[in-house]
Design a protein with these regions (language model features):
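ATP-binding/phosphotransfer module of carbohydrate and carboxylate kinases, centering on a glycine-rich
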Residues: 1-103, 149, 174, 231-417
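A short acidic Gly-Thr/Ser loop motif
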Residues: 33, 41-49, 110, 164-165, ...
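Short glycine-aspartate micro-motif
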Residues: 36-42, 102-106, 157-159, 179-183, ...
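Conserved blade-register residue in beta-propeller folds
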Residues: 52, 190-194, 215
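Glycine-rich phosphate-binding loop and adjoining helix at the ATP-binding site
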Residues: 66-86, 90, 113-180, 198-220, ...
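Generic beta-strand/beta-sheet core signal
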Residues: 108, 161, 193, 365-367, ...
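A polyampholytic, Gly/Pro-enriched intrinsically disordered region
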Residues: 177-184, 202-204, 227, 231, ...
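Short, glycine-/Ser/Thr-/acidic-enriched flexible segments
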Residues: 187, 197, 221, 264, ...
Length: 417
């Protein structure tokens, strides 16, 4: 991981690097002195949120509203999409009694982007069911600005924010030693504060502040064979049935999108080999993606002596488990989730060693981390193994894509003033 990080940061090797290490253009963490009224726009799926975030001496007050994007808007023209967003921004501002006030806005845009400045990023490709025309390759901040002009919406878009960077910013407002942000949800990614002098790909100015947050895009790690010694036959089977075959291999061993499928494949093999369920594979158990990652969380959260939750889930999948089957299935879930936590920490330890800090807080967000009963404790134990002597606190970061984006706008306002 450390070698991959260095390749991503070096301008000579960045083009072919697997872990891209994109500079976010966010140069400074909050110091708690940020004050004022800010807006945030969080667009990452078929619902988007508009938020008003009021910062008052370390205290944060938020109001927000969720808007649904119709499928014809997701798949129509870019102008239609951004005009609709501008209309919603206008409506929200009026509801907040700020119709004519020009306020700074932080824009979280959770699609693959090439960032060219703090408030400039080109869409690389649409994902998650979006296909609005005339947007790929264009600056999405510029498109939103133009829509705001067309719709007469007074807003100053000061930053485009990656959700991982937002996770770090959200936490750093209250923790001055937060230097790493981590997402452990459907996908996984990390970011951290790097010295500008270590960023060979930096194209901005080299004045103060002399740091920049790096968006690692670390889920891509492993496609050069770096993880081959750790990948099992089940990991390879999962990779075979995904649309991005051979890519995001680290993510496929860690994140919530894939853990349930890994467990299902193990169950099918053990059943076929005659070790589970009397050797009978049910049609549901034989169906890809039918064993959901939330089942791991439910099974491992069950503290009863009879593994009742496990029995309920397996019965719903059409198999009849024995008492020993239940214990085996639980053990498999634990093995898969523990491996995921340990692999995530292996990546973190490379970042922590590179930074050389003796004490730090890691801001973490994502459904896997939030909902799984032992993910956090497994991570903490592994951190003590891999980076002994460093004092590390894992802190749940609340609402990185909303509050975090507003804080990026607030820090930009503080620095420019």
């Amino acid at each position: 991981m450390r070698q991959n990080m260095d390749r991503g940061l070096d301008s000579a090797t960045h083009q072919s690097a697997i872990v891209k290490m994109f500079p976010s253009f966010v140069r400074s963490l909050p110091d708690g002195s940020e004050k004022g009224d800010f807006f945030a726009l969080d667009l990452g799926g078929s619902n988007f949120r508009v938020l008003r975030v009021q910062l008052l001496e370390g205290d944060v007050q938020m109001t927000s509203k969720v808007y649904k994007i119709a499928e014809e808007t997701m798949t129509g023209t870019g102008d239609q999409l951004f005009d609709y967003i501008a209309d919603c921004l206008s409506e929200f501002k009026k509801e907040e009694g700020l119709g004519d006030v020009d306020l700074p806005l932080g824009f979280t845009f959770s699609f693959p982007c090439k960032q060219n400045g703090l408030a400039s990023a080109e869409l690389v490709q649409w994902t998650k069911g979006f296909s609005a025309s005339g947007v790929v390759g264009k600056d999405v901040v510029q498109l939103l600005k133009e829509a705001c002009v067309r719709k007469n919406v007074n807003l100053h878009i000061v930053a485009l924010v990656n959700d991982t960077v937002g996770t770090l910013m959200s936490c750093a407002y209250s923790r001055s030693d937060a230097y790493i942000g981590l997402i452990l949800g459907t996908g996984t990614n990390a970011c951290y504060l790097e010295k500008l002098s270590n960023v060979g790909t930096w194209t901005g100015d080299s004045g103060e502040p002399t740091n920049v947050i790096i968006n690692m895009e670390w889920g891509a790690f492993g496609s050069d064979g770096a993880l081959d010694n750790f990948r099992t036959e089940f990991d390879k089977q999962v990779d075979e049935v995904t649309p991005n075959k051979g890519k995001q291999l680290y993510e496929k061993m860690i994140s919530g999108m894939y853990l349930g499928e890994i467990v299902r494949l193990i169950l099918v093999k053990l059943t076929t080999d005659g070790h589970l369920f009397g050797g009978k594979v049910s049609p549901d158990l034989n169906t890809p993606w039918k064993f959901e990652t939330r089942f791991l969380t439910d099974i491992e959260s069950d503290t009863s002596s009879d593994n009742g939750e496990c029995r309920t889930i397996l019965t719903s999948l059409g198999v009849t488990p024995s008492v020993s089957d239940l214990a085996t299935v639980r053990r498999i879930c634990e093995a898969v989730s523990t491996r995921a936590a340990r692999l995530a920490v292996a990546g973190l330890s490379a970042v922590i060693r590179k930074m050389g800090a003796g004490e730090l807080t890691i801001a973490v967000d994502g459904s896997l981390y939030k909902k799984h009963p032992t993910f956090k404790s497994n991570m903490e134990a592994t951190l003590q193994e891999l980076v002994p002597g460093v004092t590390i606190k894992l802190m749940l970061s609340e609402d990185g894509s909303g509050k975090g984006a507003a804080l990026v706008a607030a820090v930009a306002a503080r620095i420019s003033s």
